[in-house]
Amino acid sequence: MGTVHARSLDPLPMNGPDFGSHDDADLVEVEPQKKQEILENKDVVVQRVHFEGLGRTKDDLIAHEIGQVFKAKNLIEVMRKSHEAREKLLRLGVFRNVEVLIDTCEGEDALPNGLDVTFEVTELRRLTGSYNTMVGNNEGSMVLGLKLPNLFGRAEKMTFQFSYGTKETSYGLSFFKPQVGNFERNFSVNLYKVTGQFPWSSLRETDRGVSAEINFPIWKTSHTLKWEGVWRELGCLARTASFAIREESGHTLKSSLSHTMVIDSRNTSILPKRGALLKINQELAGYTGGDVSFLKEDFELQLNKQLAWDSVLSTSLWGGMLVPIGDKPSSIADRFYLGGPTSVRGFSMYSIGPQSEGDYLGGEAYWAGGMHLYTPLPFRPGRGGFGDLFRTHFFLNAGNLCNLNYGEGPRAHLRRLAECIRWSYGAGIVLRLGNIARLELNYCIPMGVQSGDRICDGVQFGAGIRFL
């Protein structure tokens, strides 16, 4: 009997395999010659799809993920669509392993060109644990987690996570529920407590909150609608905290609605070589309760272009504005901050803009832009291996952060944002840590320094996910 084995379809190129030039040609074992003609040169029909190893997973969940397999018309399409179905099944987060077997049909109703596709799956245990480390914006943390995957059989999961970092400690409980047949449409609820230390402001903040959010795609964009209610406790981190920080101390209750839209065509989020990113976020607080009221808008734009000699030119632009609603001024916990190795390099962490006695208070409006040139290391050491994780980095950054008088009008706002621009330039080395984070070691030359700014003239180290 002629049999086609496809137990691991990862090496299969999406444009169809070239059986004459790839190592995975031995995946096809055909006998006798008549069957070979049927499989290779004629249309085929997928008559049945079987699953082996299913336990608590519901049939309607997997039926949506494998529906395209039945539409395949030839052997190449069967293998490709089976590969795509395997990736979709793994993305659900309910299986530890998925293997595929493609075989000719047997039985009285078997067609001469009929195929059976069998998915051999291994479900995750009902309770799993994890231990790992994470890199944030110039901060590292240890993360312990417990997860209940596939809680009700339709890819739901409940997660408890504890994180201990250099500046922040948090724990939270979350529930995640995707829409059957459309994993990008999902709903989640989170309960959390976060305690953070912000030495640049001599501030300690503890947040206890609950949030609910819905994620969904529209055309080429992804959207998030979120409600968040949080009880915030602000306190002084040191006895030397300024009077402005002491005034901010106390308790506030924030209830806000937010919307985020993302368009992302980059090939990867860490050191992309091509593509663009546009992210726009709006937040409205006060209309659903709480004692904090404001409207907050911010955006992020990034463009990447691959050049000759494996070089990449990248440009980015950030901006935002916070408008208090009512008589109360904005809270230090809601304002924007700028400066540091992940934004305007050459300045200390969040040490640009309004300050009081050395404590930085943040601002209600900001912009920041950057231009970067990434090139391979000189002489390409370790090419094709570990050396490809490193890039040479040349950069030019600029930005400004300030408070606005909202009675002056837009022209006055733009004029103030264009005054006293901080900027810097330099060069360094970038290390990509997979698709998790990146590390930078740069030599920075800060320019446009204003009174009260804290600079980092010379070597500066940065670690994180989001960089200007």
UniProtKB/Swiss-Prot annotation:
**Which biological process annotations from GO are given for this protein?**
cristae formation
Any Pfam family the entry gives: Omp85
Kindly give the PROSITE patterns that the UniProt entry links to this protein.
POTRA (PS51779)
Gene Ontology, cellular component aspect? mitochondrial outer membrane
Domain of life here? Eukaryota
Q: How does it assemble?
A: Associates with the mitochondrial contact site and cristae organizing system (MICOS) complex (also known as MINOS or MitOS complex).
Q: Under which name does UniProt file this protein?
A: Sorting and assembly machinery component 50 homolog
Gene assigned in the entry: samm50
